[in-house]
A protein has these predicted regions:
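Secondary-structure capping and boundary motifs in well-ordered enzyme cores
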Residues: 23-26, 60-63, 67-70, 261-264, ...
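Hydrophobic cores of alpha-helical transmembrane segments in multi-pass integral membrane proteins
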Residues: 91, 117-132, 158-177, 225-245, ...
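Cytosolic juxtamembrane regulatory segments of multi-pass membrane proteins
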Residues: 194-209, 302, 361-383
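Hydrophobic alpha-helical transmembrane segments of multi-pass small-molecule transporters/permeases
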Residues: 29, 33, 73, 77, ...
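Flexible metal-binding regulatory segments at protein termini and peripheral loops
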Residues: 1-2, 92, 96, 383
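Ferredoxin-type iron-sulfur electron-transfer modules and their immediate structural context
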Residues: 1-65, 350, 358, 364-365, ...
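Membrane-interfacial loop-to-transmembrane-helix junctions in polytopic alpha-helical membrane proteins
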Residues: 14-20, 61, 153-156, 214-224, ...
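Iron-sulfur-cluster electron-transfer modules
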Residues: 21, 38, 48-245, 249
């Protein structure tokens, strides 16, 4: 079957942050220095080749950009300064936009103004909705933060959280299914038995909760920052979805609040660290920043900061009116972050990375089995 090339693929990837792709002349230094570059995944060199040749379909089914954690060594060793690490990052953004069936990711990654406008619109609608509920339908009072007569009842907010969570899960689930189809499902040369999916399923929680592959890059600090950010966000999400009553209780529930404070500090600290790194540009993986990186980090700082402020206003200073106002402002950041960033932008990486580790192991196993079968039959390997 003929392979179609897209001559404008490099130009398209430039909208997602790719730089200096044409400088690459495939010396192989990047793949040689990468600790994860091994058969059948020889990156970044092979991915760079797909891009330069305009092999869009091969790039779409390629998991290698997700197997890269951008330690920066490939860019440091590149004699042509072709920035292979940053190109792999741009490929992840491009792949995210292709997995997304709605086209929202593509819009966001190609136009930071569109993403910012969407965030502001959702924030304003969220604020108006919560205020309308509190003043008109909730039956509470702005001067009451928790308990009987609360301006925003925990039960109503909890229902809203679950509805939003189900919508997000649906969008992200469909996009993850598309990721499977592009990388594994439509490849007729791969034969993956159902039992293999079950046998390798442990990779999903292992890589999600430990980010162990990043730790193997040899740079412990970036891994620790990344892990702290991911665990802090996951902890906060679990608290909001399952322990909101304890978080908003009139009495102090230290088990819930302890985890909440730790998660908030983790989000705030890691976000500020990443912002500082992108401003100073001292580390290789911080030298280049896409607009969506800035929006993502600023939104995280906003959400974490307002989360701490509304809790302090209520718990420490007993200023219920101020706490309610700040809580509405806080939700104006939370809803866009969950509703837009999780399924369509940066946060989607939390799902795609462990899935890529899972799918890549299934791919590698199937490829090895196929090669054994072909060798036994004495036939040439498929292209």
């Amino acid at each position: 079957m003929a392979i179609r090339a897209n001559p404008r693929l490099v130009e398209e990837l430039e909208h997602y942050g790719a730089e200096d792709v044409a400088k690459c002349y495939h010396c192989g230094n990047c793949s040689a220095v990468c600790p994860f570059s091994r058969e059948p995944f020889l990156f970044p060199r092979k991915s760079m080749r797909y891009l330069q040749m305009g092999l869009e379909e091969k790039l779409l089914g390629n998991l290698e950009p997700w197997l890269c954690y951008y330690c920066g060594e490939c860019s440091e060793e590149c004699p042509r300064e072709a920035e292979p690490g940053e190109t792999m990052m741009s490929m992840r953004r491009w792949l995210t936009s292709r997995y997304d069936f709605t086209g929202i990711s593509k819009l966001f990654y190609r136009s930071w103004k569109a993403e910012l406008a969407a965030i502001l619109l959702v924030a304003l609608l969220t604020g108006a909705g919560f205020l309308l509920f509190g003043f008109r339908w909730g039956g509470g009072h702005l001067g009451v933060y928790a308990g009987e007569g609360a301006f925003l009842t925990t039960g109503a907010v909890h229902v809203f959280d679950w509805i939003l969570g189900c919508v997000l899960a649906a969008f992200l689930g469909i996009n993850c299914a598309r990721m499977w189809w592009f990388s594994i499902g439509k490849d007729r040369t791969l034969r993956i038995p159902p039992l293999a999916y079950l046998r390798q399923a442990f990779l999903l929680p292992v890589h999600f909760f430990t980010q162990k592959r990043y730790a193997e890059c040899g740079k412990k600090r970036p891994w620790a920052i990344h892990l702290a950010l991911m665990l802090s966000y996951t902890t906060m999400l679990v608290l909001i979805m399952f322990f909101l009553h304890a978080m908003h209780s009139e009495r102090t529930v230290w088990a819930a609040h302890g985890f909440g404070y730790l998660a908030t500090i983790g989000l705030l600290g890691t976000s500020i660290y990443a912002l500082r790194g992108r401003i100073r540009k001292e580390e290789t993986h911080y030298k280049h920043s896409h607009e969506t990186d800035w929006i993502f980090l600023i939104l995280l700082v906003f959400v974490a900061g307002t989360g701490i402020l509304q809790n302090v206003l209520y718990r420490v200073f007993h200023l219920d009116v101020a706490a309610n106002v700040v809580y509405v402002v806080h939700m104006m950041g939370v809803v866009p972050m969950l509703g837009l960033e999780v399924p369509f932008s940066k946060w989607a990486h939390l799902a795609y990375r462990p899935l890529a580790m899972y799918f890549s192991e299934l791919q590698a196993e199937a490829i090895r089995e196929r090669e054994r079968a072909v060798a036994a039959a004495g036939a040439p390997l498929p292209a």
